[in-house]
Amino acid sequence: MTKTEESPLHFFDIFSTLPGTSKSWSSNVLKIRMVLNYKGIPYTQSFHSYPDIAPLLQSLSVPPHKQGRFKYTLPAICHPSSVKSSPSGAMMDSLPIACHLDETYPDPPLFPSGEASYALALAIGKLMVPAALKTCDLLLPKAEEVLDDRGKEYFVRTRTEIFGKPLSELRPKTEEGVRAIVDGMKADMEVFISMLRGRGEGKKSGPFLEGEKPGYADFILVTFLSWSHRFDMELWREIMDMGNGEFRALWHASVQWLEGQGEEKEWAVPQLSTVD
């Protein structure tokens, strides 16, 4: 059976009440949505409440994370014809999925300069951490507002345990406090503007980190930008206005892959004893 004839890959996303293509909101999950759309891989999709993620992946015999607070997370895919790490053909975690899809569907390449592009993606992910942590303070309290009741209870409880205080207390109550976080986050993001701009006039063309060639490193940046686009348009516009429009150019060149959708398909979740 050829890749065009086989059953489509299935993509598992996190449920939200956001409208239209904004329903998909998690930056980690959106990385794989971008990969699927960029490569033109046919896929079906289903959306799942937070407390259903562990029983879903357990039922598919996906090996749990060996480290971290959560043993099971989205994104995940199910594609028995290519995934051999579990009996069901399912796997989770954005970077392993991205690498698997790039090997299975090599054109167009997700790492256009090979190992150098892979190293760039790892570097972007590491450099993103300070800005992402600051953004958590601003946007996590808004994220809980778009979840279903069961998802909200789970999200608030687990994130309160992680941060050591209620999510409602993460975002400063004063404009000065918010401005301090925003300015700090923007300072953390200046390095990405420099990388997108290149060494000087005429040295680089194209809106992507590697010029005219998009890659997974770009998707890490774009999905981070999408978080503010989903939850705080004023913040998103402020980020877009940074530098000489480098973020805006990257966004407009990439949004088609961010917003693309698969075919909706119901995927029942068995009721199992679970761990987070």
From Swiss-Prot:
Keywords: Transferase. GO terms for molecular function: transferase activity. InterPro entries: Glutathione-S-Trfase_C_sf, Glutathione_S-Trfase_N, GST_UstS-like_C, Thioredoxin-like_sf. Disruption phenotype: Does not alter the production of ustiloxin B. Residues 16-109 form the GST N-terminal domain. It comes from the Eukaryota. SUPFAM superfamilies: GST C-terminal domain-like, Thioredoxin-like. Its EC number is 2.5.1.-. Pfam families: GST_C_7 (PF22041), GST_N_3 (PF13417). It is an enzyme of class 2 (transferase). Pathway: Mycotoxin biosynthesis. Glutathione S-transferase-like protein; part of the gene cluster that mediates the biosynthesis of the secondary metabolite ustiloxin B, an antimitotic tetrapeptide. First, ustA is processed by the subtilisin-like endoprotease Kex2 that is outside the ustiloxin B gene cluster, at the C-terminal side of Arg-Lys, after transfer to Golgi apparatus through the endoplasmic reticulum (ER). Cleavage by KEX2 generates 16 peptides YAIG-I to YAIG-XVI. Belongs to the GST superfamily. This is Glutathione S-transferase-like protein ustS. It comes from Aspergillus flavus (strain ATCC 200026 / FGSC A1120 / IAM 13836 / NRRL 3357 / JCM 12722 / SRRC 167).
